[in-house]
Amino acid sequence: MARELRALLLWGRRLRPLLRAPALAAVPGGKPILCPRRTTAQLGPRRNPAWSLQAGRLFSTQTAEDKEEPLHSIISSTESVQGSTSKHEFQAETKKLLDIVARSLYSEKEVFIRELISNASDALEKLRHKLVSDGQALPEMEIHLQTNAEKGTITIQDTGIGMTQEELVSNLGTIARSGSKAFLDALQNQAEASSKIIGQFGVGFYSAFMVADRVEVYSRSAAPGSLGYQWLSDGSGVFEIAEASGVRTGTKIIIHLKSDCKEFSSEARVRDVVTKYSNFVSFPLYLNGRRMNTLQAIWMMDPKDVREWQHEEFYRYVAQAHDKPRYTLHYKTDAPLNIRSIFYVPDMKPSMFDVSRELGSSVALYSRKVLIQTKATDILPKWLRFIRGVVDSEDIPLNLSRELLQESALIRKLRDVLQQRLIKFFIDQSKKDAEKYAKFFEDYGLFMREGIVTATEQEVKEDIAKLLRYESSALPSGQLTSLSEYASRMRAGTRNIYYLCAPNRHLAEHSPYYEAMKKKDTEVLFCFEQFDELTLLHLREFDKKKLISVETDIVVDHYKEEKFEDRSPAAECLSEKETEELMAWMRNVLGSRVTNVKVTLRLDTHPAMVTVLEMGAARHFLRMQQLAKTQEERAQLLQPTLEINPRHALIKKLNQLRASEPGLAQLLVDQIYENAMIAAGLVDDPRAMVGRLNELLVKALERH
């Protein structure tokens, strides 16, 4: 038994690295694919188990299997200078401009690695395009990095198109004049080649001088019969060029690091930078002989070719999460802008901290598969910050450092296009699976409310409002409806969408304000969330229909003394004279707490209600500003009107008590007023009336 247990433990140790996520499999075709915690090869029943266990490879952690893989590197010290050296001055406005580019343009020193990898990718793309156009076979097209901590150097070498002596002078000797830019200019009508060229500014190479005491470049053009050359500079405004032997076709850059930048001669540090910025470069990328970019840029693939498990693993990668995406949108378009994107909605419900904290977008921005920003705050509006994913666009206007977006009409257009596409996607999902969408709205609805409140354009507010869901008086409890569906049910000639804010459906249906609306046989939306009222106040209208609170409708529709025209039997209602005398007495008792006391015949089960012009706005103002703490201050701000129901037993009894027991009658008036204020949501803390309630109970018990 002990022997079997030891064998089982040993087997578990061998399995553990393979069960980590995410994994990467080398499929028989040789092309690496992003795969789940165990590869499809490992999970497939027809695969050989021994082969399957060797297929998995992690991209987030170096494993023992990685170390056992044979190293592959083309970097070696074979170059030597031949003959004399010629000195040249930089052609772009002196050393001062070079200092600005090399020392002030970039916010982080580490981006020099990204820039040099991008340049190498461009060189390989140029060679690929040339050979394909000429019908020639493609050689090994690779990018290699090598670190040397002892010498304090980092080297990058590509097998791309290389440069002649003249190109070395023109491309590396002039700020903001790169071969990539010239190549694009020459291929304006060939979109495929143009779209794959990363560097367009010609300043990326000079980022090396942020960290370098000296930069050595060896390059040989892919043109037949080309010689190799060395380019050398310390960034002082002068560079040297000499013929060199032993130079391989392509370009090799050796950076001799400054004393305070030796960190970039560490393999671990460089690996982190490559993983951060250049994980999706199109060509094989090696660091000290080990393959780095084994992930696929699945956002560049055709959506129908990406499988669900690939989305799950890519979501975990970009979101740094362990759950699955609740929704996935793979969006590609070439008009009105070139966009390649994938968006995910996390399955995990956001916490209040996630909702309230001031965070920008969690969408990464790429330009031709090179990371520009890990959190691109300008690509999506702030209310969509719960979205995870990637946006890749060739049309994005970047500044010279390729780190900052240049706010422009194009960026605003991109933001609008993505926002509209996501809204359309959510609307489609709500129709496809209403129950799933209802859960999504329950978890993420606060973000949508924020979008409506913060949007400046009414059109945008109404677009976001299409995502809102509420219960309705016309539907069973728990069933949600949209504003569009409400509008479709409106009777001809109806202009308003009515809503009532309450903590729950029971309170909404027993509200005096809803009671007053039921007689109109009008559908009312029930809004239960704290910020619904503020949201609808900001929205104001939807589809040319005004959004009206039932409380406001009562005030506006009857903003004058209601005529006493009641056909109830005399025994069931106070007379007009009794009502007038009672209202006058109540005005005197309540004093400055009310602006007026008047009669209402819209109530049946409630004795009274308070009406305030724009009650929703007033309620929100009181809640946010925490003003009007006393009754007098509150009344001065709100100017409430108390409307009484002359048919209610409490009002009829009050009329009798005001003559026979004025003390008890005054307590009842105060309580009726407080009850109406509570029903209106205008009392923050009802504990102040506990003493009066106790006194009323004592007086009630004195009669028994």
From Swiss-Prot:
Pfam families: HATPase_c_3, HSP90
Organism: Homo sapiens
Modified residues (Phosphothreonine): 174, 494
Classification via InterPro entries: HATPase_C_sf, HSP90_C, Hsp90_fam, Hsp90_N, Ribosomal_Su5_D2-typ_SF
Domain of life: Eukaryota
GO BP term, example: negative regulation of reactive oxygen species biosynthetic process
Organelle targeting peptide span: 1-59
Keyword Phosphoprotein attributed: yes
Gene name as annotated: TRAP1
Protein's recorded name: Heat shock protein 75 kDa, mitochondrial
Family that this chain belongs to: Belongs to the heat shock protein 90 family.
Signal peptide bounds: none
Modified residues (Phosphoserine): 170, 194, 568
